[in-house]
């Protein structure tokens, strides 16, 4: 049966919570006890001092009498009662006379007779009967049993069997009533009691403070158990503290100190060492709290003494200032942790390195979550120096953080600051930095930046000046009309945030200038640096925004690197060639440069990539092929174009299926753009002049026109169905319709999209492999073939002549093959 949900109004719930008292902690109980003692002391001080002295004298005499009776073996309480009654009666008898005095003396005699009658045998017998009755009732209670119902059992037949059992009867202990004085004190204190936070015991770690250390011999197992228990206890404590901070951070700001104590190596409160796991948990927990409660804006400084604020505004300003102080203290703690592994003379142990890695990751998370808050520039400056540390895990974390900030930064303020700090770091280290310092700049969003904007602004200013002179020569009516139009246009520009765009464009221009300053400094001063590969990759990425004045010098420097440095890898060579062709395909077309030597470099390094570890580098070749075969196809001769097609198709046999598809996509696009390549589909070898030499590095003189694209026959039997279809499509002359035509969803994909969509590095085959059909294979019964035609008859006779022997469990057939062979 389902439970019925009952809705309670907010008013009833508030009244219920108001009347409900929270349980008192140990500190609250101690405070109440101290208040009670203070009230009692005030009452005693309020009485007359003479009565106090008299009471002290009486108490002293009574105490001496009690000690004397106790030494004689008598009960001092009984003697006190009798003597006190006698003295009181004698004092009253002096004031009475007549019948009252006689009645008082009769009562005195009855009381004496009652006290002396305890030695009477009848009275002793009655006392014995009472004691026996009490002992019998106690025995009956001990032997009394109570029936309790147990859980029912369901039998195999489906019947439910109820069960009961008998247990001993244990009466509930009677609760003693509180003294009236205590009740009065509690009622007086209820109005003035302030309940403290119920989490204070956990925050102040009262449990650890009260636990006394036990000195005994312990084993390794006990140490591990104690360590795990301490970790679980601190986990619970950190969870309580963090939940309180997230619930109401304005009132729980002091709880940050408890977390900061857990981050230190020695806990200042308990004077004990914190476990490494607890320190990491504390750092991560504080980071998550700040990620949740920090505002998205930058907190300003407000002087509350010089100006009056409303109560709500004052509370908000006070909270923001306190939050800012706690955030600053947390960053100082993280800086101290990272300084141990980054500075000279630091304690570099595996534990400190792991802790510093956690601290760096937390700073990265804070920079990504709140890139515009106070002290975030300090975080970025520290992370820039950690980008050049000796630990790869930290460098990877900072590298990924900077790329994320570059892609998400809308204002470009933090991006500009980070790029400036990286430039300063590379300059001070004299280009001796790790590769991550350069590769993180690849995440910059600087695709559409015009570095010639200043010249264009000067031309625009001249045009506006001439337009102004024309306006001065207009009539008064026309001037008023132009003035109104200008005001309307200005308002429209404000609504479109045109000024914002101009400021953003100016920052973006400054960023790209700083990036190219880094690149050109390394190419000029240290062309053999270990970051040369990253520099060349960055130049290839941003070559389209390089200023036209630097084109010729840059091409000369890259050509010198390609020819002089023999130890240069294939990847660096491909980046150099890609950068040069990107320059020549854009604004560099006006330059009078012969790129024949760069064609040779590219043709020589096309077969360096295969289906191995460097298969991902085939994307560099694809981007270069777009510049060479597509954008500059009209500047290439027929022999060179055919040579590139032949070598490209030869290299496709050494690639994975996604690389082969990208190669075929490039060839298909080139076939569609020019009709020169149709000769390569003809197998007649008499068309060209000479013989094709595939080992020659010069594409102009390898005689590619004398060969054909024989690799298409091999690719037509490829294991991938899309590769087979694409190879047949090219072999048929790239038809749009009819036999050999491609489906629309494959034909519209570019070479880069084919390389990405059909990538199987994530263990996903595209298209999906269908499941085999369920069914049993049909077994065909074949005929027996014999070399001798009479073998079947002789073998039948031999089986008939065989003797059958009987054993206990089975029958055996004995055949004499030896006699049959003779």
Swiss-Prot record:
- GO cellular component terms attached to this protein's record: Noc2p-Noc3p complex; nucleolus; nucleus
Q: What is this protein called?
A: Nucleolar complex protein 3
Q: What is its main location?
A: nucleus
The family annotation for this protein states: Belongs to the CBF/MAK21 family.
Q: Where is the composition biased (Acidic residues)?
A: 76-86, 181-199
Q: Where is the composition biased (Basic and acidic residues)?
A: 35-45
Q: Which SUPFAM superfamilies match?
A: ARM repeat
Residues bearing the modification Phosphothreonine: 193
Query: What do mutants without this gene show?
Result: Ubiquitous RNAi-mediated knock-down is lethal between first and second instar with reduced larval size. Conditional RNAi-mediated knock-down in proliferating cells of the eye and antenna imaginal discs is viable but results in small eye size and disorganized ommatidia, possibly due to excessive apoptosis. Conditional RNAi-mediated knock-down in cells of the prothoracic gland impedes pupation, probably due to reduced ecdysone hormone levels.
- Where does it reside? Nucleus, Nucleolus
User: Origin organism of this chain?
Assistant: Drosophila melanogaster
In the record, which positions carry Phosphoserine? 187, 198
**Alphabetized PANTHER family for the sequence:** NUCLEOLAR COMPLEX PROTEIN 3 (PTHR14428), NUCLEOLAR COMPLEX PROTEIN 3 HOMOLOG (PTHR14428:SF5)
Residue window of motif Nuclear localization signal = 41-48
């Amino acid at each position: 049966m389902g439970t019925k949900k009952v809705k309670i109004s907010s008013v009833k719930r508030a009244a219920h919570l108001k009347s409900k008292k929270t349980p008192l902690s140990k500190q609250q109980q101690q405070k109440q006890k101290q208040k009670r003692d203070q009230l009692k002391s005030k009452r005693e001080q309020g009485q007359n001092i003479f009565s106090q002295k008299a009471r002290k004298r009486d108490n002293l005499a009574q105490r001496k009498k009690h000690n004397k009776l106790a030494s004689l073996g008598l009960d001092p309480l009984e003697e006190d009662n009798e003597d006190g009654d006698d003295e009181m009666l004698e004092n009253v008898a002096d004031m009475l006379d007549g019948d009252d005095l006689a009645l008082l003396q009769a009562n005195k005699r009855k009381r004496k007779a009652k006290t002396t009658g305890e030695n009477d045998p009848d009275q002793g017998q009655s006392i014995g009967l009472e004691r026996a009755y009490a002992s019998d009732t106690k025995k009956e209670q001990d032997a009394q049993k109570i029936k309790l119902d147990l859980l029912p059992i369901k039998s195999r037949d489906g019947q439910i069997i109820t069960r009961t059992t008998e247990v001993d009867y244990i009466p509930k202990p009677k609760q003693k009533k509180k003294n009236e004085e205590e009740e009065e004190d509690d009622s007086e204190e209820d109005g003035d009691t302030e309940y403290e936070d119920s989490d204070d015991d956990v925050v102040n770690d009262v449990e650890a403070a009260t636990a006394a250390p036990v000195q005994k011999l312990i084993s390794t197992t006990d140490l591990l158990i104690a360590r795990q228990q301490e970790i679980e206890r601190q986990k619970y404590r950190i969870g309580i503290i963090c939940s309180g901070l997230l619930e109401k951070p304005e009132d729980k700001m002091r709880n940050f100190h408890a977390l900061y104590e857990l981050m230190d190596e020695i806990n200042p409160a308990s004077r004990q060492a914190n476990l490494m796991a607890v320190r990491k948990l504390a750092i991560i927990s504080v980071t998550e709290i700040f990620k949740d409660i920090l505002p998205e804006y930058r907190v300003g400084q407000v002087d509350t003494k010089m100006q009056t604020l409303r109560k709500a505004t004052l509370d908000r300003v006070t909270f923001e200032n306190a939050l800012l102080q706690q955030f600053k203290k947390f960053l100082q703690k993280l800086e101290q942790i990272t300084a141990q592994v980054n500075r000279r003379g630091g304690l570099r142990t595996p534990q400190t390195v792991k802790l510093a890695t956690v601290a760096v990751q937390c700073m990265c998370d804070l920079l990504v979550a709140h890139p515009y808050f106070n002290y975030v520039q300090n975080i970025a400056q520290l992370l820039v120096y950690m980008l050049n540390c000796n630990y790869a895990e930290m460098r990877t974390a900072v590298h990924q953080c900077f790329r994320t900030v570059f892609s998400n930064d809308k204002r470009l303020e933090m991006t500009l600051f980070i790029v400036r700090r990286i430039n300063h770091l590379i300059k001070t280290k004299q280009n001796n930095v790790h590769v991550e310092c350069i590769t993180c700049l690849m995440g910059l969003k600087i695709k559409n930046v015009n570095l010639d904007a200043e010249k264009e602004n000067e031309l625009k200013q001249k045009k506006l000046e001439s337009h102004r002179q024309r306006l001065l020569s207009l009539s008064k009516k026309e001037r008023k009309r132009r003035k109104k139009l200008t005001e309307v246009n200005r308002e429209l520009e404000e609504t479109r945030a045109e000024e914002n765009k101009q400021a953003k464009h100016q920052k973006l221009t400054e960023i790209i200038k700083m990036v190219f300053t880094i690149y050109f400094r390394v190419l000029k001063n240290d062309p053999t640096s270990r970051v040369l590969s990253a520099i060349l990759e960055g130049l290839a990425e941003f070559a389209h925004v390089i200023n036209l004045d630097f084109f010729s010098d840059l091409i000369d420097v890259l050509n010198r690197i390609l020819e002089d440095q023999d130890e240069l890898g294939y990847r660096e060579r491909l980046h150099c060639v890609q950068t040069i062709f990107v320059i020549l395909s854009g604004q560099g077309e006006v330059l009078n440069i012969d790129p024949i030597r760069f064609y040779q470099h590219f043709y020589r390094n096309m077969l360096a990539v295969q289906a191995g570890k460097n298969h991902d580098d085939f994307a560099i070749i694809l981007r270069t092929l777009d510049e060479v075969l597509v954008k500059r196809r009209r500047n290439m001769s027929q022999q060179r174009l055919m040579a590139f097609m032949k070598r490209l198709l030869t290299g496709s046999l050494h690639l994975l299926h996604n690389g082969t598809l990208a190669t075929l996509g490039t060839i298909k696009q080139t076939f569609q753009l020019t009709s020169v390549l149709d000769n390569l589909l003809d197998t007649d070898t008499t068309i060209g002049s000479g013989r094709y030499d595939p080992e020659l590095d010069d594409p102009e003189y390898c005689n590619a026109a004398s060969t054909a694209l024989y690799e298409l026959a091999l690719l037509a039997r490829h294991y991938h169905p899309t590769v087979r279809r694409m190879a047949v499509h090219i072999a048929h002359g790239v038809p749009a319709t009819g036999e050999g035509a491609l489906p629309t969803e494959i034909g519209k994909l570019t070479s880069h999209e084919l390389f990405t969509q059909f990538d199987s590095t994530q263990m996903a085959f595209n298209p999906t492999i269908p499941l085999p059909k369920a069914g049993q294979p049909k077994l065909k019964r074949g005929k027996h073939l014999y070399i001798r035609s009479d073998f079947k008859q002789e073998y039948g006779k031999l089986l008939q002549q065989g003797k059958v022997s009987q054993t206990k469990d089975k029958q055996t057939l004995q055949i004499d093959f030896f006699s049959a062979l003779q």
